[in-house]
Amino acid sequence: DLHRLIRRQRQMCIRDSNYNMPLATVPEIYELIVSDLKKAETMVPANYTKEPYARNGVNIAVSQGAVKATLAYVYMAMAGWPLNKGTEYYQLAAAKAKEVIDAAKKGTYYYKLLPDYKQVYSMEYNKNNPEVLLGVYYNLGIDALTNAPLADFLADYAYGGGGWGDTNGEIKFWYDFPKGSRKDASYFPKIILKNETQLRDWWEDPNPEAPRVVVAPCFMKKVETTTGEEFDYTNPKISMNQNGEKTHQIIRLAEVYCWYAEAVGRSKTGSITEAVNLLNEVRNRANGSVVAERDIYKTTMSYDDLAEAAYKEHGWEIAGYYWGNIATRARDMFRMNRIKDHFEYRKLNPEIEVAPGVFRKEAVSVSGTWNDSKMYLPRPFVDSSINCLLYTSPSPRD
């Protein structure tokens, strides 16, 4: 993921120490990634049977399915910005994703969707989630900052003495997010503020004499307790601290369904029926019992509509899970070159009616003129101070 965040990098193997090595181009970096993944496909098994490579009935080490799924998303990235390889690579992505899906359906891989979305990031399935193709597993006993349960909710929340407020959800994205079990499990459905016991909606600002600094929806996928019990947003005294042991879910099977459907749509080849059926599996679970309607995506939809539907479903499916996911919504926006459009929208920062007569807008404003350098982070000084070549500013397409 580093090349997508900081443009070009030095292409070095772990044994190398040549700090004068010139920067590799984006195509060269992708060539190395694809080459390594193709080799890995032939080197790792479909399933492990012995510890520490397998535990609790799931693969702990990287499996064949995980490699194939990663390669599918790499092809998706190469098809989009900045390489813009297009149809051929969307076809490669669809084919590789289908290998994973078919193997799971046949039982070669054990992967399957959990029946209820609230189970996906639960403690119940933290160590034995059959949907996770690639995960990083942690143990709270090492007392290391692994999951950071306090990072994603606001400082004025009651839980754990208050969150860090590192992130919060965007109001427009929350507003557009389809109602259902997935939304209820992704965001705090209600909140309790410090020194209160009352459940409130996130948009409430009860004290005009001391208004809240940030009023925004917050995600609760990373929250966890110190006791291992499920997080309960109705309990303001629930035990929490900065350390956690929730698994970093890097790739899930539901994402592979979405990638396959999007790749079929963008390549305009392949079975719309199969892609739609898989996408409906994802959406039906997302709706849960909250939304009665089923199979909202129809086999009569166009390839273009299928691609956009799958793109959006993936964004909702992994919303707020920037911590460990290989393909966050920001990375999807990156490969579709849509961050600039979102930048312009955020500059406008319109008020949104989140409830009858209640309007809210983002607390953090955006200003300036767009250029593609805003897609990237600056290179770390610790690296650029060693290698002066890192001061250069190449084209993102180089």
Question: Whereabouts are the PLM-identified features?
Answer:
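Structured, solvent-exposed acidic/aromatic patches
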Residues: 1, 8-11, 15-152, 238-253, ...
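Short, cationic motifs built from Arg/Lys/His that form the positively charged side of catalytic pockets
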Residues: 7-10, 252, 283-286, 314, ...
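Elongated scaffold/linker segments in the mid-to-C-terminal portions of large proteins
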Residues: 95, 99-257, 266, 334-393, ...
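Active-site-proximal region of nucleotide-activated glycan assembly enzymes
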Residues: 261
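C-terminal structured "cap/appendage" subdomains that terminate the fold
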Residues: 279-283, 287-347
